[in-house]
């Protein structure tokens, strides 16, 4: 366990160099799918951003609820994503309450609030999803000197 802690600290030290930072970004999304179902998502992205290094990337973990007739159906999801400019892409999976997994592709454009589209392969109730999400990125967690302004 000690080796992993030391490796983690070394990685954080390297990532914090030269105007870079790990970050966390909670978000809330509201949208609809092509079948007319409303959905609500909450998510948190854990990522890395740099002025001079690789493009911003992150791991997103979230929950989504689809309004179905008189009930809400819950799904969980995770994505790996890269947001090089004011837009980006991601790939991941959604899971239903029974543990079934669905491949998921996502894209979006904007900053702090952005428009989104995601496609879930084989998910009959919601293959095409459109929405808007508001996020609150918190930079320089665990140190770092990234300044987005």
Question: For each of these PLM feature ranges, what is it?
Answer:
Residues 84-87, 111-114, 137-142:
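Glycine- and small hydrophobic-rich membrane-insertion segments that are intrinsically disordered
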